[in-house]
Every structure is written in C-alpha cells, then in structure tokens.
C-alpha cells in the first residue's frame, strides 16, 4: 500500500530500477564535494573527521551558562551554541517592564559587555567555535563577542562561529523581530560587509528552516521557504554593491531533522542541489564555496513528548542518525526532557553522548553518502526537489520572499500543514508513542530544571550598577553617532561597536535604532 510522506509525496512499498528511469547520475549526483553537491559539500565528509557536535545551551545568568559551557567542553563538545532569553532576542534590557517574567527563562540574559565577559570567562575564544542563536539584534551580540575577544587578546581574524541573523523567518514562523523588513535587510547587508572586512572567518548568517518546521512546515516547505529567504539575502547583498563570491562562502543554513529518516535524507540532498544551481545559474557565482549549502541541524523538538519523556532518547537518536546520513556539518541533539523544561546537566550529557555513539560506535562515518544510488532515496530526493521548486516559484510569483511574507503566503501554507498534523495526531491516524497509543495509566514523576526567579532582580541590580559606573556622556555621544549612521547609508556596526564598548546596553542600542527605523507591526495574514 502506498504511504504518504510528511510532504504529501507518495512512498511506494517497493522501488526498483523503473523508479529512476532516465535518471542521469552525472547530472543528479556528481562526486562528493563537487557540483551539484547532492552527495555532500566535502569530498571525504565524515571519513576524515566527524561533524561538529554543537550543543545548544544557555539559561539564567551569564555565570550559570558559563558553568554549563565549561561542563559541555569537558564532556567533549566541539563547539558552543548560545541560547539567549526572550528579552535579549527582542532587544530589551532585563529591567524593562516588558521583560518581566521572561528574564533568563529560555536562554541566558545578556544586557551589556559586562554580561558577555562573564559568559565567556575562562573560555579562550581563539580555541572554540561559537554559534549564537540571535536574529534581530544579531549585530549587537556579534560585536559584544568581538569586544570580549579583544579583552582576551584574541584578534578578530581568529574568531570562528556563526550568528543566526535570519530575520525573515521571524516574520514567517517565530516572531522575535524588531524592525521592519527593509531596515532589517539593510542591517544584514551591513553585517556582511563588516565581517568581510573585520571578522573574515565568521559565518554571517544561518538561514533557518528549523523554526518553520517546528511551526508545522513539511520537509518540502521547510527547504523551499528557507532557500527563498536565502535568495532574498543574496539579492540584498548584491544590491548593496557586494560581489556574490565575496560573501556567499560565509552563508550557512539551519534545518530540522525528524524521525522520518528517508524523507529527511532526501530533503537535505535536494536542498544542496537546488542551492548550488541557484547560486550558479541565477547569481553567476564562480567560487565553488559559494555554491555549497553548508548547514547545521537540530533534532526536532516538536516531535518530543512530555508523556514518557525517556522515549525521547530514542526519537533523538533516530533524528540524529537522519541528519548524519543527510550530510550535516554540525548537529545539536535535543535533551529528552526538553518537552518539559530546560535540560538538566544529566540530560544534556546524554544528548551529547547520543552523537558520540553515532560517530564512534556505528559505521555511518565509514563512507560518504551511504544512500547514494538507492532507488527510494534518489526518487524521494527528486520528488522533494520538485515540490520545493514549485513552492519557490510561487514565492517568486508574489515578488520574492519579502512580498510573499507581506501576503502571508508562507505563514498560511505552514499553518495549513500544522493543522493537518494536529488532526492526524488527535485522530491517532498519526501514531505518537505514549500520546495516542501505548500510553501509561500513570506517568512517573520527573523533576525538571527550574530557573531561579531571583535572576530578574540580580540582572536589574547589575544594570543599575553599570549605569552608575559608566561614562554617560560617552554613551550618549556613541548613540547619537549610531542614530546618524542609521539615518544615512554608513555601516551602522562601527558606531554600534563604539556604543557597546562604552557600556551602552542592548536595550539602549536597539531603542536608538527603533527611533530611526521604527518597529515592525505584523498585518493579519487572513
């Protein structure tokens, strides 16, 4: 009996040579590390070394998160991934009325260079790669990181890492935007230019499908809308006067990995192929690195359950395997208790151990792209590619990603798919172990990690002390220069860095830009 994939595509019970009738491996596959990069962006992939194990972490104060990072490094993690709290993500200080009740809850609270210094205390920034999940205020957090590196005596040329910096998906699926799309894209172009000149090894953006998938996007929707956003960013940078080969090699992507292994592997392979062709054929990129879709993967939090949470260990292992078989460059495996609360030290360690088992106790790293030539995976790769290209065409017909966002196209498509998933789960047509089948009569108690509510008062006290100690005249002058740059065409990151060095807060810098650029107010898409 034919089944339907997450993207609504048929999965036949048996595949044979007829599934690939007329299929040209030279056109569709190529060699690993070669155009169109279907088989992976590097010739040897994991046969030389495994993917980067980058565990996402951050909660409470900078002191608490610093201790967690040091523990992760001691446990063998290869790169840090910083989670920020909602006030930081929205450009508000911890003592702002709107921040009440959210300080330190879903990530670490960072208000100034003082907090950033504590966050990375004892962690040599020339020895670790750091990813920061921050979007609308990404420029600020990058500059704070650079300032702390300078205090450590580390030159910007030695800094490696990534800022997410993908604001378009915030309008589609997540909501942590600050400025309207126009100024937001201008700020992203300024970041591209700044990093090329000042922090050349930094990945300037992580164009993200993960959040769309968590909101309900199918695999085909996930890569279609993500790549459409990527096209918008490339056009923005080119329009700002940059050569495509000057910035495209530093672009990166971020996808989800679900338990549906076959379609997930197909999705990753299709995304690489589409992006390579877009960059070559539409933008005329010449540097092979400009054609490579390098991506980070996080296992699907939306598939984790609060019921029988230990079963999530199995889900995460399967999701991680799908990401590895699909050729991810780095991976975060969720902790089994994340459907309940922030992970404990033990659950975070188990999540990392899951990756280590995949890397060192299986044979998936022994050969490149193990599914190459598989009837089912090659057919599904073609099918996902076709479905994604059709959605990308619809975005283009609306005028590109920004215009499609204003029409509510992506959001509506994702919400329709999310509703379908909810209906199938409620009816038990879609089996979720422990939720609609194989339930327990009584759940075992589980004690989650709890964030101390006193953190909010602690952060407010730190801010009061900072404002009392700093040179307010220097702060005011720097913020005035920032407003002037934002009003004109100068790169805003240079005066922004001066303001942050003078100990202006994240909220003060964002408020200065709000005065010039305004704040985004969403329109009803329905």
Which sequence ranges carry the predicted segments?
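Catalytic alpha/beta active-site cores
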Residues: 1-258, 263, 282, 289-296, ...
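Flexible, glycine-rich loop/tail regions that form catalytic "lids" or insertion modules at the edges
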Residues: 3-22, 31-37, 86, 344-345, ...
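Generic beta-strand/beta-sheet core signal
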Residues: 54-56, 82-85, 131-135, 162-164, ...
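Generic secondary-structure signature for well-ordered alpha-helical cores
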Residues: 78, 121-125, 150-155, 189-201, ...
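Short beta-alpha connecting loops at secondary-structure transitions
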Residues: 101-105, 169-179, 212-217, 255-260, ...
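Phosphate/diphosphate-binding loops
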Residues: 111, 129, 134-137, 149-151, ...
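Extended, hydrophobic alpha-helical segments in both membrane/secreted and soluble proteins
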Residues: 141, 230, 253-279, 295-321, ...
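Flexible glycine/proline-rich, aromatic-decorated loop/lid segments
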Residues: 243-247, 285-299, 307-336, 343-368, ...
């Amino acid at each position: 009996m034919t089944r339907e994939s997450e993207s609504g595509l048929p999965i036949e019970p048996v595949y044979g040579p007829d599934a690939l009738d007329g299929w040209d491996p030279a056109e569709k596959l190529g060699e690993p590390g070669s155009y169109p990069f279907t088989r992976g962006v590097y010739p040897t992939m994991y046969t030389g070394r495994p993917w980067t194990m980058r565990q996402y972490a951050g909660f409470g104060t900078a002191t608490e998160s610093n201790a967690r990072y040091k523990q992760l490094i001691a446990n063998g993690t290869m790169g840090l991934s910083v989670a920020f709290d909602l006030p930081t993500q929205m450009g508000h200080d911890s003592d702002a009325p709107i921040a009440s009740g959210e300080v330190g809850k879903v990530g670490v609270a960072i208000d100034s260079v003082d907090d950033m210094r504590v966050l990375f205390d004892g962690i040599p920034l020339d020895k670790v790669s750091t990813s920061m999940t921050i979007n609308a205020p990404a420029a600020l957090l990058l500059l704070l990181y650079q300032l702390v590196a300078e205090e450590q005596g580390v030159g910007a040329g030695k800094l490696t890492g990534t800022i997410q910096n993908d604001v378009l998906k915030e309008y589609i699926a997540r909501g942590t935007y600050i400025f309207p799309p126009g100024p937001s894209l201008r700020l992203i172009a300024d970041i591209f230019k700044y990093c090329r000149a000042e922090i050349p090894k930094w990945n300037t953006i992580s164009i993200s499908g993960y959040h769309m998938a968590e909101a309900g996007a199918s695999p085909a929707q996930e890569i279609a809308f993500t790549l459409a956003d990527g096209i918008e960013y490339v056009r923005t940078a080119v329009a700002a006067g940059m050569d495509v080969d000057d910035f495209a090699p530093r672009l990166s992507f971020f996808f989800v990995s679900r338990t549906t292994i076959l379609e997930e592997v197909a999705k990753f392979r299709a995304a690489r192929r589409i992006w390579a062709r877009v960059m070559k054929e539409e933008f005329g990129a010449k540097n092979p690195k400009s054609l490579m879709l390098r991506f980070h993967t996080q296992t699907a939090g939306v598939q984790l359950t609060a019921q029988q949470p230990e079963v999530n260990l199995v889900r995460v292992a399967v999701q991680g395997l799908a990401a590895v078989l699909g050729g991810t460059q780095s991976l975060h495996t969720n902790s089994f208790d994340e459907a309940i609360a922030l992970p404990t030290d033990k659950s975070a360690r188990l999540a990392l151990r899951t990756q280590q088992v995949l890397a060192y106790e299986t044979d998936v790293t022994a050969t490149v792209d193990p599914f190459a030539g598989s009837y089912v995976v090659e057919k599904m790769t073609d099918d996902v590619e076709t479905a994604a290209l059709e959605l990308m065409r619809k975005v283009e017909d609306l005028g590109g990603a920004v215009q499609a966002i204003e029409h509510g196209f992506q959001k509506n498509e994702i919400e329709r798919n999310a509703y379908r998933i909810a209906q199938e789960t409620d009816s038990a047509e879609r089996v979720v172990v422990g939720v609609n089948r194989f339930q327990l009569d009584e759940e075992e108690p589980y004690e989650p990690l709890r964030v101390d509510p006193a953190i909010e008062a602690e952060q407010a006290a730190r801010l009061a002390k900072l404002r009392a100690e700093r040179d307010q005249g220097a702060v005011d002058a720097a913020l005035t220069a920032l407003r002037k740059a934002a009003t004109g065409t100068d790169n805003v990151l240079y005066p922004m860095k001066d303001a942050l060095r003078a100990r202006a807060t994240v909220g003060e810098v964002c408020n200065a830009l709000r005065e010039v650029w305004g704040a985004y107010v969403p329109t009803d898409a329905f």
